Curated annotation (Swiss-Prot):
GO cellular component assignments: cytoplasm; phagocytic vesicle
CDD domains linked: DHPR_SDR_c_like
InterPro entries: NAD(P)-bd_dom_sf, Sc_DH/Rdtase_CS, SDR_fam
Protein name, per record: Dihydropteridine reductase
Assembly notes: Homodimer.
Length: 231
């Protein structure tokens, strides 16, 4: 019987790559996003990550008798600015919606749909391990995401028994958007999306390879060599 992976943000750059990779390994792929992913076996579109939409998509997946072996939240965004920026509060609201609420929505979906012993992964940020004065809203929401990861690893965090809650903390991902806005950067120091998908597949298929429940896993690429560090 094939296993199931659910990706929130399955139409974005990272999410679509994860769907593509797992599908190539004969996994049943499920995408939830604001737009359809035609490559996924099941693609659910939502208008927002509010309570009604999330409850509705959970019901739709349950109606297909699908239980999830791996859940990955690849949804999110970035915004710069410090407290003096004219659009600071606008960026705060945007980052809460894109980063923090998507993490909370993921936690609820995972609690309802993940199999016992399953893998649950949120996308944090290496930058949020330190001060982020030039991008306060982004750093704060990613730091809060790290907190959620650890809470879900607790016995009473709400995930099914035996589950592993992890955070992946990239430095810079090699995405079309990053290439567009940082065209002068050294792309050899950016992590290919395929490497992230491959690592998630390793953790999904070999539970012994997983970091300790609640771990934040930082990864950084230098000269096309990626180092993964469990924090």
């Amino acid at each position: 019987m094939s296993k199931n992976i659910l990706v929130l943000g399955g139409s974005g750059a990272l999410g679509a790559e994860v769907v593509k990779f797992f599908k190539s390994k004969s996994w049943n792929t499920i995408s939830i996003d604001f737009r359809e992913n035609p490559n996924a076996d099941h693609s659910f579109t939502i208008k927002d990550s509010g309570e009604e939409e999330i409850k509705s998509v959970i019901e739709k997946i349950n109606s297909k008798s699908i239980k999830v072996d791996t859940f990955v939240c690849a949804a999110g965004g970035w915004s710069g600015g410090n407290a003096s920026s004219d659009e600071f509060l606008k960026s705060v609201k945007g980052m809460i919606d894109m980063n923090l609420y998507s993490a909370f929505a993921s936690a609820h979906i995972g609690a309802k749909l993940l199999n016992q012993g399953g893998l649950f992964v949120l996308t944090g940020a290496s930058a949020a391990l330190n001060r982020t004065s030039g991008m306060i809203a982004y750093g704060a929401t990613k730091a809060a995401t790290h907190h959620i990861i650890k809470d879900l690893a607790s016995e009473n965090g709400g995930l099914p028994a035996g589950s592993t809650s992890l955070g992946i903390l990239p430095v810079t991902l090699d995405t079309p958007t990053n290439r567009k806005y940082m065209s002068d950067a050294n792309f050899d120091d950016w992590t290919p999306l395929s490497e992230v998908a491959e690592k998630l597949f390793e953790w999904s298929t070999n539970s012994d390879s997983r970091p300790t429940n609640g771990s934040l896993v930082k990864f950084e690429t230098k000269s096309k060599v990626t180092t993964w560090t469990n924090l």
